[in-house]
Amino acid sequence: MKSKMFPFVAGIAVLAVCVLSPCMAQQSAMTGVGPGVRYATDAYPGFDSEDEIVNPEKKEPRWFSFINGPKMGDSKSQLRYCRELIAADSCSRACKELDALVREWPMSPEAPAAQLLLAETLSEKLGEYEDAFAEYRYLLDFYSLACDYSAVAEKAYRLANVLREEGKSVIWFRFDNTVDVRRAYESLVLRAPGAAFASEAMLTIGGLREDEGKYEQAVQVYENLRNLYPDSKEAAAAVRREADSRMVVLREREYNRSRCKDTAGFLGSALAMCDGDDVQHIRSLQEEVLSMLEADAFRSAKFYDSRVRTSRSAISAYERFLSEYPRGRHADEARRRLEELKGDSQK
């Protein structure tokens, strides 16, 4: 297969416009994320702005069309001729003629069928997956009301997965392409939030955010996935991934008590949402976070245990610490120091 990942990436991203104004007018009642919903009405935290999505370009007749234009004189005859070529296994030639039909007679009744046949032939007969994706995209961009939207979007998504997996095998290219591929999946979710693949796509987006090292955005994506598709298997997988991403942020950033407490709260909730091996994993993360909070609380208590502070302040600080962490790692040390301070105060 030809290596044309950049056109593929641009192609997926452009899919975002597959339900522009004509389609949206027809489907204005379809909102939310239920089955059949074609476009998102809410913000998607962790996604990039739609401003960065490439606008589609309409096909135009080629120069010197008398040489490389359609062979037949009308769209109906041209489509029949293309099907004959495919039946004769002249698929490459058929693709050129199908493309010529769409360019020459874009408003004809045969144009949507020709565009679909072009995409299918590239994918199923020639294995040209990147080109096929671009043609499915074009079908959705310009013939969204004349095609089976859900079926075509599903085919485009399957091709996106194939191309993403192939990109993984090219190590020196994979990481350069991560951002563009993520934006491609985002555009699919934004324009087809009710599709069967939407939750799976969001899980992929979260993983790609992690690949970029954008763990805070990954957390947002996973959290939104759980909220939008709570009963999906991807929502269950997102719990552990969100926990791991939150921990990366916690470990890499300067200590922040609010962030730490928020993470501890999430991990407590996560225990009720997971099962199997994930339970033990979440518990180990929870213990790590609680250890961070305890260490911070102990540092705060020791802050009051100095010559510039009164013994009463230090005693109160250690008592507060022990009331919160009676069995903590620093509890014994805090008790010993508390007894010393109380003994000194009675002298």
Name each region found by the language model.
Residues V9-V19:
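Bacterial N-terminal signal peptides
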Residues K2-F6, P22-K347:
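Acidic, polar-rich low-complexity tracts and alpha-helical solenoid repeat scaffolds
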Residues M1-K2, I12:
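Proline/serine/threonine-rich low-complexity "mucin-like" segments in extracytoplasmic/periplasmic regions
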